[in-house]
Each structure stands twice: as C-alpha cells, then as structure tokens.
Amino acid sequence: MLNRYLDISTEVKEALEQGKPVVALESTIISHGMPYPQNVETAMNVEKLIRENGAVPATIAIIKGRLKAGLTAEEIDYLGRAGHAVPKASRRDLPVLVAKGSDGACTVTTTMMIAHMAGIQVFATGGIGGVHRGAETTMDISADLEELGQTPVMVVCAGAKSILDLGLTLEYLETKGVPVIGYGTNELPAFYTRKSGFGVDYELDTPEELAAAFHAERELGMKNGMLVTNPIPEKYSMDHKVIDKAIEQALAEAKAQGIHGKETTPFLLAKVKDFTGGDSLESNIQLVYNNAVLGAKTACALAALKG
C-alpha cells in the first residue's frame, strides 16, 4: 500500500533489480545540517564517493508529497536552497506531509523507513539521534532509536551526537535488541570525537565482517536494524574537552531560550559550530564522507554475499 507513494529513481531501481549495491542517504543533513552551499556540495560529494567505491547512492527525501528514493542534482539543490523552510520529517509527520503534498527532509528514522520500503539495506549518515540529557524528566528520546529497533536496515554513522546522553542511548538500544558495532574500535565514537568512554557490543574490522553479521541478522528473521559506529578520521577528530565545553554552553542557551523537541538538535549543532569557530562543521563534513565510503564498501560486500 505504501508503495503507491514511493518513487524510486531509474538508476536505483535498476541497481536493486540487478542485485547491485545501493546506499541510502538522508536529507536533513542537506536542509538542516549545514548552511548553503556547503550542504549541496557535501551531498554531491557523498554521492560521488559512493559511486567511486562501487555502489549506487540513493538520497531520500519527500518532495511534493512523494517519497523519493534517489534524488536528481536539481532536487538536492532545491532542498539545499530551501534549507530550514523544509520541515524535518520523522515517522509521525509522514502521513500529513504525503496527504498535503508537502516537502520533507528525512531524518534517520524516515530514511530507514523509506529505504526499507524500497529494498535498500545499507544507510550511511553522520550521527544518530538518541536519549537527550535530562530525558528522565523531559522524555526527549529520538525516534531514531525506535526505528533501529523495528526496521531491518544497517545504519553506518560516527556514533550518537555528543550533545546526547550516550550511556542512556546505549541502554535504550540494548532494550530494543539493536547490536552496536564498533568499526575497528571497541569504544563508542561520539560524532566529533573518536572516544566517548563507553564500550560497544562488538568490534568488527572489515566491511566483509559487517556484511556477514547483517546478513546473519536477516537470515535469523530478526526485524531490528544494526548500528555500525565508525570513528571520525583522526585528522579531523576534535578535542573532547573543547567539544564538551561547547556543548555545555549550547545546552545552557537552549534551556534559557526554551528550545525543545525537534528544534533541539539543529539549535545545539549550530551553537557548537559557533563556539568552535566553524571547526565542527569541517569535522561534520569529513565524518560523513568517511561513513559514505564504509557504507559503500559494506553494501558491495553484502551484494557479493547474497550474489
């Protein structure tokens, strides 16, 4: 039933039909994650990196009420220019946006949903949402965690954003039965930094190992996803003391201004960028590139395994 609202681009459709590797990409990073024109440049570079590493990119968004798996360069530019005017679309927003024929920038949650509808199994992004600090009183918990617990897609990221309560985020993922894998590390990376002080469930060291674990999860009939955490390259990793200080300042400002709900993450990331003199934006771009490469290599290994 949902497929009547889904448009899969010709390139992505052909790749899926032929069993070729495809990597899903989200669109909130375009509209909300970075300023124009870096957002469009980054999105196009990510697609290029995925192609260079043997897979087909499928950027996912909602345009005029249609769920799109695979965007044209013009559609990416359209989202990039519109920026914050495009609403962030989580699971709860889909029915209304579709019914009204509206645009929507897909979060990790909706990218996973639409990727699964389209038959795409690997998704590369920057970082996931999670349990916000103070969630024991606010109940501010990202829908990304629920989606990981119920949608069989591998999400390759640089860990949960360090503005979150990472310990509670890991506890929540454990409850949902989601394996948290460290790629070449036994420690959870925290987006801008390679270390967090928290362990992962398993360390795997090659795209082939990642593909084998995900393939086994599917063969076992499990309905949940898998979270692969890939540390930001050393060269672009930020000093955790600098980031922690910036986050504390950003959290204090958010509280003072009454920022909450889905406005929280874009507000905090923008403030962290200001406090770090823009260094965090460059780190953000580089970790997305790094995840795109790993996503493509893993999608290729998965296609070979199934082929």
Regions found by a protein language model. Give the residues of each.
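N- or domain-start disorder-to-order transition segments that initiate the globular core
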Residues: 1-19
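Solvent-exposed alpha-helices and their adjacent loops that cap or buttress functional pockets
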Residues: 14-17, 22-23, 52, 114-117, ...
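General beta-strand structural signal in soluble alpha/beta enzymes
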Residues: 23-25, 58-62, 104, 122-127, ...
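Glycine-rich nucleotide/cofactor/substrate-binding loop typically near the N-terminus or early
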Residues: 27, 32-34, 40-96, 219-235, ...
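Divalent-metal (Mg2+/Mn2+/Ca2+)-assisted nucleotide/phosphate chemistry catalytic cores
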Residues: 71-152
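Active-site glycine-rich loop that binds ribose-phosphate moieties when present
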Residues: 107-108, 136-149, 153-174, 208-212
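Anionic-ligand binding region
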Residues: 194-219
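A C-terminal functional module that forms or caps the active site or interfaces directly
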Residues: 222-290
